[in-house]
């Protein structure tokens, strides 16, 4: 089994203050890996560098065999991203948002399957503006998996989840891992 993510000597500073200082990390294909730590520990910075959305000051990063800083569309087609917050979709329904996002991928999952997987079947045709915080978070997870990615980045994915939603989320993560999906997530707990 190959490494999905390899990081060596990763460094990133903001205004002279190190957010990440010399991180080495290997995540195997199909592994579920969590970065655990308090606010300001560099978890989100590390994930954003691995996603290719933030530049690094030093170090080597390979994600699915590619340096994310120069990665193209075919590489991005292999990853799913769930950020800490999302916005701009309030006038759509979850079904519309997922269907729209699915169109940018070459092999997306079935939208109704994703809606069921994230527990939004009863809210699929409700405007997103009318969803609770936990329901919006479930939609964020759906948006991250609808492309059928090989690798999913989840930044604080269970924020706003009630206990049952959190259990359902971990069941979904186990199912994705059982299908061979690599998962990198950040969490405080």
Stretch-by-stretch model annotation:
Residues 166-179:
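Helical segment within the ABC ATPase nucleotide-binding domain
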Residues 152-155:
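Catalytic Walker B motif of ABC-type/P-loop ATPase nucleotide-binding domains
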Residues 99, 103, 108-124:
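Conserved ABC ATPase "signature" region
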Residues 51:
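Helix-to-loop junction immediately C-terminal to a conserved catalytic motif
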Residues 141:
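Hydrophobic anchor residue at the start of the ABC signature
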Residues 59-70, 74-75:
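Conserved ABC transporter NBD signature motif
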């Amino acid at each position: 089994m190959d490494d999905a993510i390899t990081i060596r000597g990763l460094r990133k500073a903001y205004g002279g203050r190190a957010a990440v200082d010399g991180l080495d990390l290997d995540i195997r294909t199909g592994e579920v890996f969590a970065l655990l730590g308090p606010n300001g520990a560099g978890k989100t910075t590390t994930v954003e560098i691995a996603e290719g959305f933030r530049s690094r000051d030093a170090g080597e990063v390979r994600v699915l065999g590619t340096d994310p800083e120069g990665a193209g569309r075919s590489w991005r087609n292999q990853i799913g991203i769930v950020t800490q917050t999302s916005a701009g979709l309030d006038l759509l329904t979850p079904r519309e948002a997922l269907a729209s996002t699915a169109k940018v991928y070459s092999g997306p999952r079935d939208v109704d399957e994703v809606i069921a997987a994230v527990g939004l079947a009863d809210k699929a045709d409700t405007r997103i503006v009318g969803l609770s915080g936990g329901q919006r978070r479930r939609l964020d997870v759906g948006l991250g998996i609808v492309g059928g990615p090989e690798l999913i980045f989840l930044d604080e994915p269970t924020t706003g989840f009630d206990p049952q939603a959190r259990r359902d989320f971990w069941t979904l993560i186990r199912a994705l891992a059982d299908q061979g999906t690599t998962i990198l997530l950040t969490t405080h707990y």
